[in-house]
From Swiss-Prot:
Record note on quaternary structure: Associates with the 50S ribosomal subunit.
UniProt cross-references to PROSITE patterns, sorted A to Z: G_ENGA
Keywords linked to the UniProt accession: GTP-binding, Nucleotide-binding, Repeat, Ribosome biogenesis
Gene Ontology MF terms in the entry: ATP hydrolysis activity; GTP binding; ribosome binding
Residue span(s) of domain KH-like: 353-437
UniProt domain EngA-type G: residue ranges: 4-168, 177-352
Binding site for GTP 2: 183-190, 230-234, 295-298
Native source species: Desulfitobacterium hafniense (strain DSM 10664 / DCB-2)
SMART domains in the record: AAA (SM00382)
Protein name in the entry: GTPase Der
Binding site residues for GTP 1: 10-17, 57-61, 121-124
The keyword Repeat appears for this protein: yes
GO BP of this protein: ribosome biogenesis
Matches recorded under HAMAP family: GTPase_Der
Amino acid sequence: MSKPVVAIVGRPNVGKSTLFNRLAGGLVAIVENRPGVTRDRLYRDSEWLGRKFTIIDTGGIEFVNENTSISAQMRRQAEIAIEEADVIVFVIDAQISPTPDDDMIAQTLRRSGKPVILAANKVENFAKTELYEFYNLGLGEPVPISAVHGMNIGDLLDEVVSHFPEDIEEEVDPDTIRIAVVGRPNVGKSSLVNTLLGEERVIVSNIPGTTRDAIDSAFEHEGKHYIIIDTAGMRRKGRIEELTEQYSVSRSLRAVDRSDVILMLLDAGEGVTEQDKKIAGYAHEAGKGIVLVVNKWDLIEKDDKTMNRFEKDIREELGFMQYAPTLFISAKTGQRVTKLLDLVDFVAEQNSTRVATATLNTLVREWVHLNPPPTDKGRRLKVLYATQVGVKPPTFVFFVNDHELMHFSYRRYLENQLRSSFGFEGSPIRMIVRQKDEERE
């Protein structure tokens, strides 16, 4: 099941980014008063009472300065919050009376029909703070908090989680591969999905997704079962086309959460953009299998070196995703689209690969012998043994004499050796380093 989405909204300088950091468990978001900064740290995952969720910081919303381009952009971010959120946290400044912007935001949120929690921030004295003025916003009882000091955040999270949709697991055959097609607007997601489904004559059914607005297409190919999670299919009637690219990120997050393999679409005419990096980064952190799909290849003037140059550029821009295979296609003409499902099968298998402990440790000893760890102040790292503890993604624990001696370069060396020996193409690898005395913890 995809994680619920919690959007933090409010006018500028009420403490949204500070609250965002609190709810994200201290993960770094840039906190400044300069417009646009928080857009670089738009989303993070968090957990409370066993429920995982995604937090979105929408930036400051202003209605009073309605003629400025910045204000218009912030209002579009309000639309993003309304469209995407399961729960909205409306942050206000408890130290001043409600402003006209607060009133306008409250009106917008009331019309949304979504659960809205009013978070009265910057409360210094919980016993003496009067919040009766904020009842006029029509959003119920304010929850007093101090994001800076972390006070009453637990009560706020209790309220947030109480509004989440029921946590119901999907009933899907374990052998079915769930494919998420993600990417920026107009990169060709719908065309690719239509081409894939158009070529596969045995469409089994349309399955309502666990998100409230997704329709998943189930089909068979050569006796194998697939479900396409189509983010492009999440478009609603209205003004969705006008929303900013943050909306596409948020839609993609939901698809990524529910997938086994991700088809990350890139536009051959534009290369890798900052928005592409955000989506790819989330896919990498989620531990899913991934294929980089360069679409609109038919529109590119080419020579015999064009493909190699383009792939090199991708590797430079997405340096953290060197393991992902790349396929150049045209969803419009069908060029190489038939190869996609074979690649999906391969990547799904790689992401589920298990390595026997005895085999792994024999190789680890060889790797350490070939390239001994460097010393640090006279002390040398000793890799005692290793074991695989999970798949999707493949996850390994390395027990060592002192985890602080594991330099990132040696960690990278071990990961490269794992890939050289066992493949894991299209799959991230998780490495956990523990001291021997941590084994029993």
